[in-house]
Regions:
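Short beta-strand segments
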Residues: 27-31, 64, 87-89, 120-121
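Active-site core segments that coordinate phosphate-bearing ligands/cofactors
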Residues: 58, 62-65, 75, 82, ...
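Active-site glycine- and acidic-residue-rich loops that bind
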Residues: 8, 64-71, 127
Length: 167
């Protein structure tokens, strides 16, 4: 296990890539994710880092929305046959999930039978999506919210499950 602020992930990129190529069972813990660390200024806002890690073949990337997802993310990282990047926020986040989204890659956390739109978030933005869904509902727009902590894990699910999350 190794860790640093997420904005410094670029300094670790060669080691992360080599770990993925060699299927090394390493857990990289990155903290201080999201624009929620605004008081540190733009040099400490890791805007593009998540996308760049997600394209490394063999690297499992998990960005939990809350402590429930973080617990399950650790379980998944400990059993994954290769490296995992756990991308964690700095700020305290409300509990918005039961944690199962991590196992499946994505899960509906706010369901509306009459949803006109689906808001998708990862990490700290899931709670923002939940708040946005409430505001939309007050304006007469029904919305569902999906937490998607791991694109790769979601893509591995059967099409029936994927279609149930995104009808």
């Amino acid at each position: 296990v190794g860790g640093t602020f997420f904005v410094f992930a670029d300094y670790m990129r060669p080691a992360i890539r080599l770990a993925a190529l060699s299927k090394a069972r390493i857990i990289f813990v990155f903290t201080h994710d999201s624009v929620g660390v605004g008081e540190d200024g733009p040099t400490h806002q890791p805007i593009e880092h998540l996308a760049s890690l997600r394209v490394i073949p063999g690297l499992q990337v998990i960005r939990p929305a809350d402590s429930n997802e973080t617990k399950v993310a650790w379980e998944c990282a400990l059993t994954y046959p290769g490296p995992t990047a756990l991308v964690l926020s700095r700020q305290s986040l409300p509990i918005t999930t039961d944690g199962d989204a991590v196992r499946y890659g994505a899960e509906i956390v706010v369901e509306s039978a009459k949803a006109q739109i689906v808001l998708v978030g990862t990490g700290s933005e899931v709670s923002v999506c939940v708040d946005a869904a409430k505001l939309l509902k007050d304006s007469g727009v029904e919305a569902s919210v999906v937490s998607m902590p791991s694109f790769d894990r979601f893509e591995m699910q059967p099409s029936q499950y994927r279609d149930s999350v995104f009808p």
